UniProtKB/Swiss-Prot annotation:
The keyword Cell division does not apply. Residues 136-156 are annotated as: Disordered. It comes from Shewanella sp. (strain MR-7). Pfam families: AAA, AAA_2. This is ATP-dependent protease ATPase subunit HslU.
Amino acid sequence: MSEMTPREIVHELDAHIIGQKKAKRSVAVALRNRWRRMQLDADFRQEVTPKNILMIGPTGVGKTEIARRLAKLANAPFIKVEATKFTEVGYVGKEVEQIIRDLTDIAIKLTREQQMGKCRQRAEEHAEERILDALLPKPKNDWDSTDSDANSNTRQIFRKKLREGQLDDKEIDIDVAQPQVGIEIMSPPGMEEMTNQLQSLFKNMGQAPAKRRKMKIKEAFKLLIEEEAAKLVNQEDLKEQAIELVEQHGIVFLDEIDKICKRGETSGPDVSREGVQRDLLPLVEGCTVTTKHGMVKTDHILFIASGAFQMAKPSDLIPELQGRLPIRVELDALSADDFKRILTEPHASLTEQYIALMATEGVTIEFAESGIESIAKAAWQVNERTENIGARRLHTVMEKLMEDISYEASDKSGSSFVIDADYVSAHLDNLVQDEDLSRFIL
């Protein structure tokens, strides 16, 4: 898991997300508390439960982007899900326990990569021996010591050449394990155990024998390393470690939680809204979920929920779920100045992306200060007049602004363009001023 301090986490998030200090600090503290909890005594550690977070803010201000960046920083099992994708147990659709199953699959993959990384050196040695066996088959009769010594010397010469890369382009015939065909079986609630047994049965039936293939040594070496590393990984230990990782360090990001709030009086069963909230409750407060890898306890999994809450309020969530999200963070709406910073400050900003894309065609693009101000102002004005979609409006405005250059770039190699206030005005003013055009085009 990540050992970064809250200040380091916020600094890393600042490189990609403009503003929203409160949200960044809350997320950073929650992530650091995962590490702090693991430093406690085992008995006391069980009593410390995570403080789940509810992020509230209009669309396009950075809620989902914080989740994406946090996934890379966490170095722990992390899953982002849309709350709208789930329905109440017993109805058609995904049930919420699938979140934990998917999170466990992510942990298995993460743990497998870590374990394969640890035994990579041994795997490389085994792969090297297999390639040398293909280049220099061992003699059937081993009784002649002279031939044996000569073969050993030749093997060392080839080993040296192999390590120096002199044999990379040489082709060899080698037996490579065939990839297994995965079979996914949908099961009704309560029958997961039977489904897991069926999947194991099909998996064993579908194991194809190794196939002899002709390939270059460089490609064969990579494949054999993966194959040998997989053999060295103990599957039972892998599952135990992965489940431990999920239970102690897992993070679930629930996006669009406002869309499952109950709106007004409804007569029928609300299976995709209040029903989902009721099903989420046991997960958030702690329960045991059956997965194909084993039983997973959710008591110490951190849940971060987010929503725009434009058509609903946080108080529209069922009271029990509100109580399980004690930390509330409100994200601020973006101003024209924020748009200007978004265009220039983040790593791989929008302007840098367009400059790099056009450079592949030999076209030089320069964004003048006045041009960036005009783009930010145009995006902000359209948001104010029509639907406010936050920073996502910049993508629409930039694409419309760069449309002509992008279309003609392949025919104008060596050309240079300066995007200043006049250029922006010429291409966007009519669209920005005309509310009907803004609504449909920008």
